[in-house]
Amino acid sequence: MSGLLVFSEDLTKYDFGPDHPMAPGRVTNTISLARQLGVLDRLKIVPPPDIDLALLETIHTSDYIAAVQRGEPNQQYGLGTSDNPVFPGMHEVAAWVTMASAEAARKVWTGDVQRATNISGGLHHAMPGYTSGFCVYNDVAVAIRWLLDNGCERVGYVDVDVHHGDGVQAIFYDEPRVMTVSLHETPAYLFPGTGFPSEIGGRGAEGTAVNVALPPGATDADWLRAFHAIVPHVLRAHKPTVLVSQHGCDSHRRDPLADLNLSLDGQRASYLAVANLADELCEGRWVSTGGGGYAVLNVVPRAWTHLLAIVSGEPIEPITPVPEAWRIEAGESAPLTMSDGAAATFRPFEEGFTPGSRVDQAILATRQAVFPELGMDPSL
């Protein structure tokens, strides 16, 4: 199995400032940890290609791109807010992140590798004409559009970020060739306020938008139960040619911006589940990205190092010690192992519905909304 990372130090310049949660240390700490654990030695590493404005324009409007290039606050385009402050070189680095995800897609689609990742990407909130939720350009959507434009028949997109993947869903809402699947904290409590089960796709694409809105406090067992009750079934019905996934790790219980209760072990289990679906359904063709995640030291580097290891084809065992040199770099509170000590087990939904469970209610709501559109019985 061949795995590839698209990366250069230029991608770490995506930086909204020292007090912003989208800290570049999320990526630099991950690269350092992955290097010290030998994970980078098992991956091909290539830099992003030169910026291609025409590629950006397959998703984003020319006037919006021009506004980003000017680098000035502009409320019409969402630029200059507290979430999305303008910073020097914003257009260039956001475009490089986008080129990196498109290059990952190209490498997989042309058969150079089976698996490719861009941990700097996953900017799933960006809309065609405005910045949103720390996301300037929607690299995931550009990568998916590139696949479609280059002969890919169907794309499956799985988003495990705690926030709904609203930008990707909106962009492909009327596109039956793209199935977007998002598991997130309920929008009744959390940004961006979308991602209800009733959002199932536009006319002619019904059943290709799949939303699992989980209650605050959902655990590993809850999340994995929901994933396996829905995601394999809908993807098998869609029959994707390539699987694209976004791996925001802000579902972790220590993340400061959300309210789910997953462990690192549960997140690792989710990455393995996505990889297995790519192997089952797409002959291994899998393009992955990073995403959210704001516990910059204790969670993100370990989570994404696990992702990189899985992309390489050689997963890291959870009991693996964190290298002492990395812990010294990180400081006194650095974790000791690549695990939170959780079992990451779950009871399959098929073993029985629990009426009083808010998680089971969320699962059933999604199955009832989507399964009939795909010719499946939600009760089975």
Model-derived regions, located:
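Charged, often glycine-rich, active-site loop that binds/positions anionic groups
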Residues: 49-73
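A general "terminal functional-core" signal
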Residues: 2-6, 12, 67-380
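N-terminal low-complexity, Ser/Thr- and acidic-residue-enriched intrinsically disordered segments
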Residues: 1-57
